[in-house]
Amino acid sequence: MSRRQEICRNFQRGSCKYGAQCRYLHASPHQQQQQQQAKPNPFGFGTGSRQQQQPSFGSQFQQQQQQQQKPNPFGFGVQGANAQSRNAPGPAKPFQNKWVRDPSAPTKQTEAVQPPQAQAAHTSCEDPQSCRQQISEDFKNEAPIWKLTCYAHLRNGPCNIKGDISFEELRAKAYEEGKQGHSLQSIVEGERNLQNAKLMEFTNLLNSARPSQTPSFPTMSSFPEVKNNSSFGASQTNGPPVFSSFSQIGAATNIGPGPGTTAPGMPASSPFGHPSSAPLAAPTFGSSQMKFGVSSVFGNQGSGQPFGSFQAPRFPSSKSPASSVQHRDIDRQSQELLNGMVTPPSVMFEESVGNNKNENQDDSIWLKEKWAIGEIPLDEPPQRHVSHVF
């Protein structure tokens, strides 16, 4: 027995480092026994062993069928008869793809038999009953998975339920609250309260449905920070007033309570002296309702004047003590500024006298380019020689 026919002990242990170049056989004892049985007679004495090893034609066909029925080990479906039985009935023809992903899925024939469901376009709502019916159908057939959203039961109509919050915004809010030190339980509880409040809004809308034909405009009530119920109505809170019209700005700008304060929408005096005949209030500028320490912005106007004959405003001549003091301060400051910019005459006279005094002195010392030791003068140079020195 040669060394090549001996089984490698290191291979049986799984630690042979020679691989295919090993002098010993890399095979299990069972494989070696099968190879010895299948090996023909090397000396050629008789053909019995060869005849036994040659399979018949029937056995070859059975083996081929078994190989075809065996599933693909790579997971790309099945082969042979299994593929035909799973797909559409009948033999597969070229250029005909009849493969169905889900056998229970409806085919085109069944879809053609079933009539399409007519989806009514909700464009009008005449009475509360029809509105409630439309809303209930929407909640039944088109209920949103994400509840924190808006809803309008009319196409191109106003939003009946406002306040859309996406899950990204909710996640960002949770992270922000986590950084601020809030516990996870409180964050989850707040999100649950938001969802319950939104579900309650849907329920209330279904119970109290009202017809609505008005177009959808962005309102201030869409934002949760504003407490006002309407964007164009009067304010119901203590915050900044929301005016119903531009004519109410003058009435709302009254500082402090007083007899001249009027309610929004009430007629007030006209800026031209006669009362307004329109039901709206007077404009802001020129109305007698603004109180800043004077009776009116433009003074008292004569009544009954037409629009074209508007006279010049007569300003009140009386001045308050505070305003007069302020004007005096301004005049004094402006005078000081002007005095600083213009040289006083006294300074100019002193400079001229100094120049005349220096004219009698010897100027040769100031005209030298280099001074010797002891010749440096202690006095200031005359003004006329400053440019020559520097």
UniProtKB/Swiss-Prot annotation:
InterPro entries linked to this entry: Nucleoporin_NUP42, Znf_CCCH, Znf_CCCH_sf
Q: In which tissues is it expressed?
A: Expressed in the adaxial face of the collar, nodes and the basal region of elongating internodes.
What name does UniProt use for this protein? Zinc finger CCCH domain-containing protein 46
Which stretches of the protein fold into C3H1-type zinc fingers, per the record? 2-29
What keywords were assigned to this record? Activator, Brassinosteroid signaling pathway, Cytoplasm, DNA-binding, Metal-binding, Nucleus, Transcription, Transcription regulation, Zinc, Zinc-finger
KW Zinc (keyword) present = yes
Please list the GO biological process terms of this entry.
Answer: brassinosteroid mediated signaling pathway; negative regulation of brassinosteroid mediated signaling pathway; protein ubiquitination
Assembly and partners?
A: Interacts with GSK1 and GSK4.
- Comment field (misc): Plants silencing LIC are short, have increased leaf and tiller angles, and display both reduced number of rachises and seeds. Plants over-expressing LIC show erect leaves.
The record's subcellular locations are: Nucleus; Cytoplasm
Key word Disulfide bond present in the record? Answer: no
Q: Which GO terms of the cellular component aspect does the record hold?
A: cytoplasm; nucleus
Q: Please list where the region (Disordered) is annotated.
A: 27-129, 230-284
Compositional bias of type Polar residues: which residue ranges?
Answer: 106-129, 230-248
Q: Where is this region: Required for transcriptional activation activity?
A: 146-211
Function of the molecule = Transcriptional activator that binds double-stranded DNA and the single-stranded RNA polymers poly(rA), poly(rU) and poly(rG), but not poly(rC). Mediates optimal plant architecture through brassinosteroid (BR) signaling. May act as a negative regulator in sterol homeostasis. Acts as a negative regulator of BR signaling. Binds to the specific DNA sequence 5'-CTCGC-3' of BZR1 promoter and negatively regulates BZR1. Acts as an antagonistic transcription factor of BZR1 to attenuate the BR signaling pathway and regulate leaf bending.
Q: What induces it?
A: Induced by 24-epibrassinolide.
Q: Name one Pfam family in it.
A: zf-CCCH
- Point to the regions of Low complexity compositional bias: 48-76, 250-268
Protein modification: Phosphorylated on serine and threonine residues by GSK1. Phosphorylation represses nuclear localization.
Instruction: Enumerate the GO terms in the molecular function aspect.
Output: sequence-specific DNA binding; ubiquitin protein ligase activity; zinc ion binding
